[in-house]
């Protein structure tokens, strides 16, 4: 009985994590859905544990509303670098990815990580795969 009462006290996000199959959720299906640039609502919350956030271009919001289009969804992908250090090859790959899939910026943070912005849903998988290939990670 104690476990049930504690379970009820969990936040909505904790309930989503609890039923997510080790943070998998339905992210795979969300990424395959060609009808929208967004992820399913529960997956939007889960991807932060994979080092990414769903965003949209606010500058285009009113123009897209007038045309009855959904917001221009895009993603921020965070790359962890132990001690904030990368090899020259890792740096070159991150720079290439920012040009190829992002909005041509690579942000350095005060938390020893890098951020790509403007990644479209269809480019999330190849971006993260390439990050992993050079032995870096997006996991939070």
Language-model features, listed with the residues they occupy:
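Feature of Fe-S/electron-transfer and energy-metabolism proteins
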Residues: 1-140
């Amino acid at each position: 009985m104690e476990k049930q009462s504690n379970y009820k006290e969990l936040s909505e996000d904790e309930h989503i994590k609890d039923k997510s199959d080790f943070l998998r959720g339905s992210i795979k299906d969300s990424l395959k859905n060609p009808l929208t640039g967004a992820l399913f609502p529960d997956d939007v919350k889960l991807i932060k544990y994979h080092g990414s956030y769903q965003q949209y271009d606010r500058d285009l919001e009113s123009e897209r509303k007038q045309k009855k289009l959904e917001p221009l969804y895009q993603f921020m992908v965070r790359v962890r670098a132990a001690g904030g250090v990368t090899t020259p090859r890792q740096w070159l790959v991150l720079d290439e990815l920012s040009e190829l899939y992002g909005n041509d910026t690579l942000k350095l943070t005060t938390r020893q990580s890098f951020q790509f912005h403007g990644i479209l849903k269809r480019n999330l998988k190849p971006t993260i795969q390439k990050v992993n290939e050079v032995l870096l990670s997006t996991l939070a």
